Amino acid sequence: MAKKAVSEAKQTGAAVQGKRIGIHLSTTGGVWKAVEYAREIGANTLQIFSASPRTWRAASVKPADAEKLKQARLQLDVGPLVVHVSYLVNVCSQSDETRQKSITAFRGEVERALALGAEYLVLHPGSYRGMTREQGLVLAAESIEKAIDGLPWQDADFHILIENTAGAEFSLGGSFEQVAELIERLRKHAPVGVCLDTCHTHVAGYDIVTEAGYAETMKQVGQTIGFDTVCVWHCNDAKAARGSKLDRHEHIGEGMIGAEAFRRLLHDQRFAHAAFIAETPVDEPGDDARNVALLRTLFAG
């Protein structure tokens, strides 16, 4: 099944147009190689890490690599480019040491994203364990403001996207209201938007599976975050049940959310401007191509 998906994706990759559908890819061999591979599997947008997501230190982007990436994107029409922040960053940590390391690391993330010409940088707000949610919100906003202070983001087509979380205890961003509050605090100080994750939304307790549930959930999105603020959807099926708070991604159509929910989302004109990017497992060769191909099929059908 995976081999068939790769073959079909490669046949159609050069002709991909319109809807921005992609996947998170490795940058092994060079970030521009990820762009080339994205096209091979039928994607016209992608997400990457700009450095190892499990280390605090990272090298700066080499100008030659940034230029190769720029040319590859222009030639292959791949965009937007989304960079995901390291998992270590916690901008609302109660620990002064962790928070300061997070501010420094996040500043590096912004610098690398700008150097790469990325349109979006996705950030998990973090954990406010040991504090109130309000204190966590204040710290998160202050930390982000400190991290970007003095950086030339005003001259770029660039936004920091706050991602909703799975709703685990002390996790900031588990509800649309929390995401909206953080965005509102940041609007005057940073270029911000939102990334919504289907798996996180589902396990946090929102219904996106049934038609009526989807309508109610999107009503809440409109009333809190606003549709235009959602720049990216992370398209991930879920291994766990709605409301479980367990962030376990599954292949599109093989989890508790199901293919029909993704078809409904991809056809929702309120998100016609957004990019749709999978962060699905790679259990065997060809899984990336298979998930991209299924999302394209659901959009076409």
Predicted segments — roles?
Residues T12-V16, E36-A43, V61-V82, E109-G117, ...:
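Acidic (Asp/Glu)-rich catalytic clusters
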Residues M1-V85, V89-E111, G301:
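N-terminal pre-domain/capping segments
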Residues A58, K62-D65, S95-T98, S102, ...:
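Residue-level preference for long, well-ordered alpha-helices that form the structural scaffold
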Residues A2-A5, K10, A180-G301:
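Histidine-acidic metal/acid-base catalytic patches
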Residues A38, H84, S102, A113, ...:
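Conserved, mostly hydrophobic/aromatic
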Residues H24-T28, A51-P53, S86-L88, G126-Y128, ...:
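Active-site beta-loop-alpha junctions enriched in small/polar residues
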Residues V91-G193:
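Active-site acidic/histidine proton-transfer and metal-coordination neighborhood
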Residues V31, A66, S102, F106, ...:
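Aromatic/hydrophobic pocket-lining residues that form the small-molecule binding cavity
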